[in-house]
Every structure is written in structure tokens, then in C-alpha cells.
């Protein structure tokens, strides 16, 4: 009996074929320029031996890389401000004593319940096939921003090179839905 080793699809994955969205950030979604499926790493458990080498066994801890999104900044900076205000809402950027009405998304008091809908959001990456139709859907659960790059201004450029920023996110997990 012969084995069929032909792949189901002979088309290569194009880096141009994607749609990305984070529920909390509609303007960032529209101007997204680049996004990558984060790395995934499995921990190892070393098993010492009587010899000079040790054996490695797969562990049970999974570590995900960062979700990194590069986007063009619109002239009103609305998409930059979406992320900036999200970061500001989950941190104490103005000090420990938040004024009335300036509490973080976590709540005003230490015992108040965490406002998860304000802190986290879900994200979806639609990977498109060669005909630019949805092929795979990857969902990211409990996404939150951890970094936002600088906004560069430069009067020495000879051509208009639109401003791009990169936002870095952490998340609890990601899954391939389809």
C-alpha cells in the first residue's frame, strides 16, 4: 500500500493575508500594519543521571511570547490614544492617590472587584488563504497592553513617511478556532 505524501494545499501562506481586531480598539484594528502569531515554549524538566549528560523531559508549563501589533497612527492620534488610555486606566500613572473619578480599571479600593471588562479584551487574528478568504481564526483571551513605542517626528525626511507605532500585549492563551 502506497502512502499519499501530497499536501492538501500547495499554496504558501502569504504575510499580506490577515485581518486583526481587538474589541477595545477599533481604530487600531483599521490601521494595523503588522502582527505576528506569538511564540510558544514548553518548559523542560531536567533529570540528572550518573553520566555527564542529563535527560530532558517535557514539563507542564507553557510560556507564550508577546503579541506585537504595528499600526499607522492617524492624524488625530485616536488609535494611539486608545492604547495610551487603556494603559493609563489599568495603572496608577498619576500616583497612588487617585482623585475622585480617576480610579484605575481595577477599582478605587483595594477590596473592590476587578473590572475585568475594563482591564482585558479579547482579540482575533483571521488568517486569509491565497484567495483572501478567511482560512484560520486565532483567538487571544484576556489581552492587555504592556508597552507602546514612541511617536517619532522628523523634519529632515524628504518624503512623507507616515508614523508607525508598535503596541505590545500579554494574554492568557491563544487558540486556533478554525
Label the model's feature ranges:
Residues 1-178:
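Glycine-rich, low-complexity intrinsically disordered segments
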